[in-house]
Amino acid sequence: MRGADPNAPWLLYLHGNSATVASRGNVVRYQGLRSLGLNLAAPEYRGFGGVAGQPSENSVTEDARHGYRYLRETLGIPASKIIIFGWSLGSAVAVNLAADVPSAAIVLEGAPASLVAIGEMRYPWIPIRMIMRNPFESALKIGRIDAPMLFLHSPEDKIIPIEEGRKLFEAARDPKQFVEVRGGHIDPADVDASVYFGTVRSFLAEHGLLTRSADGAALKRRDGRW
């Protein structure tokens, strides 16, 4: 989705589990992110949203890589204008991708340090590490990313506890920023929109990724809540 400024940075949006690119939570985020003046691309994973195939850690990462290659090779977008954004499971996919390709900045929302660790916490009587086929060990990979990173996480998150996000933050290289938002795992972009999108706007502006007009623009949604 191109914005009004064709020269604006592109945001590669990677959604979470139990969702599709058309899910309401994703659409709310698209609207707010595009209001910053960004162009946006949101590839769908195989096995999601009617796309054929069986999802796995390797397959969703490859689908994200295909979206990145589309921006670089088909549209000719330089890595210096690509922001990788991941929410929930998509944040783990974003780490996998960003560990291997250059980018301008990374934004992670509700990010787990390790899906194995979350499984072990919830089911301590099961040998999760032995049987889990898609561990998404983000904390072991994030140190390879040298782009600026923003972490958004809610203390009310019952799906990916905020402690997981902090562990991942600690494993990341500088420059990095961790910001708490309200709304649990699903709704920060809705119930805490001004903090959520205002933080993203400030972070991108700090790293030279927003035009002056976008940096100074007031966020406002059609229902008036931004």
Sequence positions of predicted segments:
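Catalytic histidine neighborhood in serine/cysteine hydrolases
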Residues: 166-188
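Acidic catalytic loop of the alpha/beta-hydrolase fold
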Residues: 155-160, 186-187
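Primarily recognizes the serine-hydrolase "nucleophile elbow" in alpha/beta-hydrolase
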Residues: 70-74, 80-125
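Membrane-embedded segments
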Residues: 1-70, 98
